[in-house]
Amino acid sequence: MAKKGKKYQDAVKLVDKNKVYEVVEGVELVKKAATAKFDETVEVAFRLGVDPKRADQQIRGAVVLPHGTGKVQRVLVFAKGEKAKDAEAAGADFVGDADMIAKIQGGWFDFDVVVATPDMMGEVGKLGRVLGPKGLMPNPKTGTVTFDVTKAVNEIKAGKIEYRVDKAGNIHAPIGKASFDADKLVENLAALTEALNRAKPAAAKGVYMRNVTLSSTMGPGVRVAVK
């Protein structure tokens, strides 16, 4: 543990905690500070000027990162008939209906994203108590409740991520791996930032993006300036 502690302290010394870095410089610092033996995930935390307690200031959605996250997403699709065939053809890892519902009720969770056709939501809704807390419940706002399962699966496999403001007004999301070229991380961050700017609630007052911090899984936070 001491060795890990020293690595972290060395990484901390690279970062001026009182400085707000330009995005490119910030990304380079995060990559340099990622010294773990595994390929660390690069994450971003947005502190937004919204009041999540108000219904008109909820922020939730999804965006396809141009270079993906570096993680292969296992997709489960609830669909029947032709839509089930479409999902399989699109590359869904698991496709089913009542059989998959029973499997999940039995404690199976070997998937990362769930898509459902609207006609299946009556049955899928029974899984709300187990899928909801894990952030896996399909939702129209994130494009995971749809009859266009081909598009949904393709987007997820291409690097689509979901975002949702928490109770404190923060949004946390992965934007790639430390092994990514810096320009790819910069472009992924830009895509997410643009999506959040588009999602700004009309009722939000004052500064919208109050604080944006990048970090790797084991590294220190680096504040950056985004537009």
From Swiss-Prot:
Disulphide bonds in the chain: none
Lineage: superkingdom: Bacteria
Keyword set, alphabetical order: Repressor, Ribonucleoprotein, Ribosomal protein, RNA-binding, rRNA-binding, Translation regulation, tRNA-binding
CDD domains in UniProt: Ribosomal_L1
SUPFAM superfamilies assigned to the protein according to its UniProt record, in alphabetical order: Ribosomal protein L1
Single GO term (MF): structural constituent of ribosome
InterPro entries, sorted: Ribosom_uL1_bac-type, Ribosomal_uL1, Ribosomal_uL1-like, Ribosomal_uL1/biogenesis, Ribosomal_uL1_3-a/b-sand, Ribosomal_uL1_CS
GO cellular component: large ribosomal subunit
GO biological process terms on file: regulation of translation; translation
A Pfam family assignment: Ribosomal_L1
Quaternary context: Part of the 50S ribosomal subunit.
Function description: Binds directly to 23S rRNA. The L1 stalk is quite mobile in the ribosome, and is involved in E site tRNA release.
HAMAP family documented for this protein: Ribosomal_uL1_B
PANTHER family: 54S RIBOSOMAL PROTEIN L1, MITOCHONDRIAL (PTHR36427), LARGE RIBOSOMAL SUBUNIT PROTEIN UL1M (PTHR36427:SF3)
Family per record: Belongs to the universal ribosomal protein uL1 family.
Protein name (Swiss-Prot/TrEMBL): Large ribosomal subunit protein uL1
